[in-house]
């Protein structure tokens, strides 16, 4: 049961390598204590964005953050870890799949 919740925190963001969209788009993901029957989750499990797009993580509930998972991001991308209980954002400039989790809840 605990491993099921871990999957809720491993989120992939897929960047399209060839974007025909000249305007950047934004996505917002809420950090939540509960969503439906799941606990300690992000409001969206997968988000598809283009290079240049920004994802905003909203600290709707307390006790959460966002951290890129080591080995789960494209080569050349710097590590990223937000502060707890704070809204944060990241602009994606390198195409690829980005895995991330909530640091205090990664082993649930």
Task: Give, region by region, the residue ranges found by the protein language model.
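Bacterial N-terminal signal peptides that target proteins for export
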Residues: 2-9
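Extracytoplasmic copper-binding redox domains, predominantly the cupredoxin/blue-copper superfamily
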Residues: 22-108
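Bacterial N-terminal signal peptides
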Residues: 10-18
């Amino acid at each position: 049961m605990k491993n099921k919740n871990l999957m809720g925190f491993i989120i992939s963001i897929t960047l399209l390598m060839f974007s025909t969209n000249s305007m950047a788009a934004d996505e917002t993901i809420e950090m939540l204590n509960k969503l439906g029957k799941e606990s300690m989750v992000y409001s969206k499990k997968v988000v598809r964005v283009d290079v240049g797009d920004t994802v905003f993580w909203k600290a709707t509930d307390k006790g959460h953050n966002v951290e890129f998972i080591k080995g789960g991001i494209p080569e050349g991308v710097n590590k990223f870890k937000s502060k707890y209980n704070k809204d944060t954002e990241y602009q994606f400039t390198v195409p690829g799949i980005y895995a991330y989790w909530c640091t205090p809840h990664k082993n649930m």
